[in-house]
UniProtKB/Swiss-Prot annotation:
Transmembrane domains' residue ranges: none
Region (N-terminal catalytic module): 19-248
Positions bearing Methylhistidine: 19
Organism for this UniProt entry: Emericella nidulans (strain FGSC A4 / ATCC 38163 / CBS 112.46 / NRRL 194 / M139)
PROSITE patterns the record matches: CBM20 (PS51166)
Descriptive protein name: AA13 family lytic polysaccharide monooxygenase aasA
GO biological process assignments: polysaccharide catabolic process
Length: 385
């Protein structure tokens, strides 16, 4: 069966141009896309490599654990202006949280995927240091650490963890600690898009529209003021692996690591209590940073599906501040106290000087407020679409 599908894949490879990337929590790739730097976030690809049936055979090379997009020559293994300088979300050790990636309609190659957290802070710090690009050897060492720190499907009580239907017993891929896509040639709910069964354009890709792929992971008993969550998808159809990472913080764990001393970001960082026990927050301040180019008289607002964001009413939308705006960095920002665990949709809008409203394009953005100790903060960054 695999040899037949490989032949079919070989005949189709020139037609397949879209793939997938981590969206929740916001990966470095997603932030690069929203900032207008990455024109094809689903196109960070490690290829050609041995991706199947041995899921860990491929060396990550230049792609590293965070991905390299050759289309735009962006290496996400080092911090940039719009990613890598601070956590995008703070989690509490032991929590079960929802994670999501986006697969393109034209590049749903089936296969299996996994998440990992490397608990070697010295290694991780190499990927948090502005101006430093880790070597290929350091990238591989980090990927090995992420594989060791796998966040297994089986760690989440009650979660269904199936074997991949395109993998036979006895093959290295016959394991259910990794998450699996559905059968590549299934008549209904095929491959990775079949995991959620979501509608086309339920998430954003630039080739043919995307489908969400949602699972749950359990945050390990570990603490770090800034670390990385790595996502890896091994394709069944093609000789490709997709790697992405998101900057996160973890509080409340028994194991801990010192804050990185090599980073020099002046952006507001997520605060984390030093105690391993803490009072849980009821709400946390979430800072929304949006890159929106405006003209004199225009103002930017945040409208969303919850009451704190006006329940989609433009007259009750939350105003952003342009106090940090410049021609080179058109930043609008606002901090809103939001209830922990709340999941909502939102969009940015412009209010013109004549009172007219302009909504940004594309599907609604989505966000889940993290849980954490009292004093925890979170940041969500994006760019006008």
């Amino acid at each position: 069966m695999k040899s037949l599908l490989a032949l079919v894949a070989g005949n189709l490879v020139t037609a397949v141009s879209g793939h997938g990337y981590l969206t929740v929590p916001a990966s470095r790739t997603r932030l690069g896309f929203e900032a207008g730097i990455d024109t094809c976030p689903e196109c960070s690809i490690l290829e050609p490599v041995s991706a199947w049936p041995d899921l860990t055979a491929a060396q990550v090379g230049r792609s590293g654990p965070c991905g390299y997009n050759a289309r735009v020559s962006v290496d996400y293994n080092q911090p940039g202006d719009y990613w890598g300088n601070e956590p995008v979300v703070s989690y509490t050790a032991g929590d079960v949280v929802e994670v999501q990636w986006c697969v393109d309609h034209n590049g749903d190659h089936g296969g299996m995927f996994t998440y990992g957290i490397c608990q070697n802070q010295t290694l991780v710090d190499l990927f948090l240091t502005p101006g430093y690009l880790p070597t290929n050897e350091e990238k591989q060492a980090a990927e090995d650490c992420f594989l060791e720190g796998e966040l297994s499907c089986l760690h989440v009580p009650g979660q269904t963890c199936n074997y991949n239907p395109d993998c036979s017993a006895g093959e290295p891929c016959y394991q259910n600690d990794w998450f699996t896509c559905n059968a590549f040639q299934a008549d209904n709910n095929r491959a990775c898009q079949g995991v959620d069964g979501a509608a086309l354009n339920s998430c954003m890709t630039t080739i043919a529209g995307g489908y969400t792929v949602t699972k749950k992971i359990k945050i390990p008993d570990y603490s770090s003021s800034h670390t990385l969550l790595r996502f890896r998808w091994n394709s069944f159809q093609t000789a490709q692996v997709y790697l992405h990472c998101a900057d996160i913080a973890i509080v409340g764990g028994s194991g801990s690591s010192p804050s990185p001393t090599s980073t020099t970001s002046t952006a507001t960082s997520t605060t984390t209590p030093s105690s391993t026990s803490c009072a849980s927050a009821i709400s946390i301040p979430v800072t929304f940073n949006a890159l929106v180019t405006t003209t004199y008289g225009e103002n930017v607002y945040l409208a969303g599906s919850i009451s704190q964001l006006g329940s989609w009413s433009t007259s009750s939308a939350v105003a952003l501040s342009a106090s940090k705006y410049s021609s080179s960095s058109p930043l609008w920002t606002v901090t809103v106290d939001l209830p922990v665990g709340a999941t909502f949709e939102y969009k940015y809008i412009k209010k013109e000087s004549d009172g007219s409203i302009v909504w940004e394009s594309g599907p609604n953005r989505s966000y889940t407020v993290p849980t954490g100790c009292s004093g925890t903060t979170a940041t969500e960054s994006g760019a006008w679409r």
